[in-house]
Amino acid sequence: MKRVLISALMLFIFTASFAQKFNWNKNQVIAHRGAWKKNNFPQNSIASLNEAVKLGCYGSEFDVWMTADGVLVINHDPEFQGLTIEKVSYNDLLTKTMTNGEKIPTLEAYLLEGKKQKTTKLILEIKPSLISKERGIEVTNKSIEMVQKLRATDWVEYISFDYDYCKRVLALLPKAKVAYLRGEISAEQMKADKLTGVDYHYSVYQKDNWIENAQKLGLTVNAWTVNAVPEMQWLLAHKVDYITTNEPELLFEEIKKTPVAQGWKLKWADEFDDAGLPLTKNWSYDVGGKGWGNNELQYYTDADSANAVVKKGNLNITAIKADKDANHYTSARLVTKNKFDFKYGRVEVRAMLPKGRGLWPAIWALPTDWKYGNWPKSGEIDIMEHVGYDPDSVHGTVHTEKFNHVIKTQVGKALKVNNPYTEYHVYAIEWFADRIDFFIDDQKYLTFNNTKKGSGDWPFDQNFHVILNVAVGGGWGGKKGVDDAIFPAAMKVDYVRVFQK
């Protein structure tokens, strides 16, 4: 009996010592063709794979083709240095060398290299054959055979632009993680066909609540190929599962910056992806032309595309020289009142400002129910104001009964901004029960603290709503007159997002 127990114990120790212990990276970064760009490594090389591992990427994506003599090799394009991969032998390919001295990797060599670590997944893309569908299925079969032969199943996830290849992978490996790339198949259909994820171009997700709906079905959502900061931040804000990028180093930096990384959750947003008039589910209009308490000169129109229109992914609020009632200018003032009202949170707006003396663009918030009485008793938060006669200067301001511009006690600060008329900047506040912080491009430049002395100091314990407008003239904006040569003049808004904790 004692001998049996000792033998069993030794078998357990032996088995445990050879058991795989994985520690897959828990982030959203998939290096597209490996991490090649920053260090000028060849794409789809062993060097780019190892760099992705070194960076700590969740995955390193690579592409599989088959030579004329049946060897599986790694390359993105159908040609490798002038040779059509599917029409030449592997030995023909060996006559060519990558810029770092590597030969074209075989799938076997790539998997063996990938298996040396247990932190970064290998994202295997099966390329559609240019010769025949049947050949593509053969590539799929042989890829699975190689993965199984090398016992690399735990490392590998699969993607393809051919839906039949995806289904073939699942027929051979029912537990494999498989995602489809092309973009035309619904999340519901992929779920029914037992795919585990969707991997579409990021533009597909910018409508119809794609990300949220797919995730509700239990599908992972990956976006390709995302190399610019605005798209990265949009996807991160919407909690996409993975992002495939040529810029993994940049994406890691953006992940650190995103509000989501600071514990914020996106509650409401308008990304302005639907061309035409602004969405009525999100926005109403303040309409009229009687000065708006500031002796402004414009008439704010109601759903007039000359003054408020979405095109090319931006909301354009345009002030123009046009007669309306007793006014000689028209513009627009959009509000989320009674469509999205909120108390506390982070509001961020990415915008490019109009240039010209006499303009007064603003991104701000007013109380929805005026809990403590009319202005200024119930408060005002000016996230961004700019007056055209003071170029490149942007203001953040708070108004209350005790602190307001009428009695010259308002609390605010101006900050110089580089190229506000030709580049987009992110204007934001973070509003808590004890303070309001103001930011431009993540630089905090003002804090207004709750003194806890009552609503005269702090009326900011009630619902507010967002306002976007471009005024003309006014006591502040028109202090040095209006230059009629500047019209039309538009504030372009890329997005409005509100986060809460």
Label the predicted regions.
Residues 1-23:
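Bacterial Sec-dependent N-terminal signal peptides
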Residues 257-501:
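GH16 jelly-roll
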Residues 15-16, 45, 76, 398, ...:
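Residues in and immediately flanking transmembrane alpha helices
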Residues 9-10, 35, 66, 78-79, ...:
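Short, flexible active-site-adjacent loop segments at beta-strand->alpha-helix junctions, enriched
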